[in-house]
Amino acid sequence: MDETQQLLYKFKNLTISENEKLKLKEKADHFYFNTEKEILTDNEYDILAEQLQSTNVGCSPLISKTDLPLWMGSLDKVYNDKELNLWIKKVASDKYIIQCKLDGVSCLIINKDNKLKAYTRGNGKVGTDISHLIKYFIKDKCLPNNIALRCEIIIKKETFNQKYKHAFSNPRSFVSGVVNRKQENIVISELNDLCLIAYELINFPVNEYQKNILTQIEIIEQLNFIQFVNFKTISNEFLTQKALSNLFKEMKNNSLFEMDGLVILANTPYIRVTEGNPKHSIAFKVRGDNVKEAKVTFIEWNVGKTGVFTPKVHIVPTEINGTTVSCFTGFNANYLIEKGIGEGAIILVTRAGDAIPQIIGVKQTGVLTFPKDYEWKGDCRIVEKIESKERIIKQILHFVESVDIPYIKEATINKLYNNGCTSIELFLKLTQKDLLLFGPKLSSTIYNSIQKSFEAPIEKFLSGYNAFGDYIGEKKILLLLQKYPNLFELENLDAIDLVSIEGIGSKTATQIKQHFINAKLIYNNIIQNKLFKGVLHTPSKQNTVELFKVCVSGTRDPLFIQELKNRGFVLSDNITKKVKVLIVKNSNEETTKVKKANSVGITILTLEDFKQKYF
């Protein structure tokens, strides 16, 4: 099995770690937004997102990356009456609009200052410029000035089944493939089979109140060139799980397009959010139909690298849709307390997407028992009071995976722990003699792998030590070091300054600030004990050089690329107006990037010339 298959197997068998969940989400986002293939169903993705608790839906596209002119958020999801009622209390309205949640490619069409542009959603902040496709969707019609439309690019089910079903797994994968295709590979007949369906009209300035949804619909209908998504108007007494589930089935059966839920919107004016998900609208999703009752036999508590306990709910083996299921994720301690899940509880269970075991309700509460020697961390999690063997092994394993040390698995670390290797520091100081318990040949291989890890980038080391806490890995640490080359010489960090770094949001900034003192201690320990021999992010010449975005063509020398990152230069995969210098291996070679750089006046330097000027 390749890495993706291994992650999927672990996810579906509830043996996946938090770090692996992040990797799986990144891969799922990549496949969903950039390819014609999906590795998780919508239900499976929703469950993964719930397990991670905090997630950014979407993935930066691989072609024609560009900053989006407007924030294109996703939607919070609700599944039951309790969640619906909580939302209704926050967003009161006389009328609610129920739209089909179409399963296509989300896009934005915008006419600002009489310039018509189109973009796919990407990750909400960075998307793909698809302005060259506008003429295929709205023909000769023009959107009024200072107006934007959020739309779905989609294909009719009938058209897909007649013409493309043999080659694509589902309609959405076909649409994604057509939209993300390079201009020179466009097939006009395929584009002509796509439909553009509007679901939000945005007026400028965007920081002022937007019109209510019914008014938006009237305006869009007057434009007379674009179809609005199918909708119904209801009052709040009909906003129940049962009524919406029936409505979903009805609308899905009658829909010309694939849909994967309902969108509920309060019919009131609203301010568009500039980050996160909108408050005036939510998505209603229907869980799988194969729901069974099951009795809980016991709760298994597993400790992770940070000492946090993750519960696994074991049940009397129960068959769901032909597969016997015996355990489910319990998310966290507070989840079990709130739901009343413990030994003897009768729970309602299903397999989301016919794959992932999922608890969807509780019919009868049970008795919850906790592990020994725990304490509360925050509002929902419990942690170990004393560091256990299991926790230390997972810490070392996380380090091994972060710095890419081959040949070392959990069983290897378990054996080392039993022979006195009880910390990352001791692991890094292992001699070949210490490793002889694995035999002369394997001991030499493991020793050499550990020694090579000393040369890994410092951001990998800090990620391996979990210096800034869970979910802050090498990518975000690298952003920090690029912004602050002397990071660990600073007394403290300002959360507002951190948020100004592209790629770091307010929650991440707060976590970095909270962990900064501990991260400094870890960093100083690494340096003082000579556990690191790689390149530090020293300020050297970059303090006197104005940093900028560069593009590299004709060479992917890993040492040079790493040095660019270390010095704080931002790498672009393509020539854009924000690129200042194109770095080439050979000045005489006229590539596509060289031609484009010349056409827009971007400076072109050879690798050696760039080093001489900026390093």
UniProtKB/Swiss-Prot annotation:
SMART domains: LIGANc (SM00532). Keywords: DNA replication, Ligase, NAD. GO terms for molecular function: DNA ligase (NAD+) activity. The keyword Aminoacyl-tRNA synthetase does not apply. The active site is at 101 (n6-amp-lysine intermediate). It catalyses: NAD(+) + (deoxyribonucleotide)n-3'-hydroxyl + 5'-phospho-(deoxyribonucleotide)m = (deoxyribonucleotide)n+m + AMP + beta-nicotinamide D-nucleotide. Coiled coil: none annotated. Signal peptide: none annotated. It comes from the Viruses. Its EC number is 6.5.1.2. The keyword Transferase does not apply. One of its GO terms (biological process) is DNA replication. Belongs to the NAD-dependent DNA ligase family. Catalyzes the formation of phosphodiester linkages between 5'-phosphoryl and 3'-hydroxyl groups in double-stranded DNA using NAD as a coenzyme and as the energy source for the reaction. This is Putative DNA ligase 205R. It comes from Invertebrate iridescent virus 6 (IIV-6).
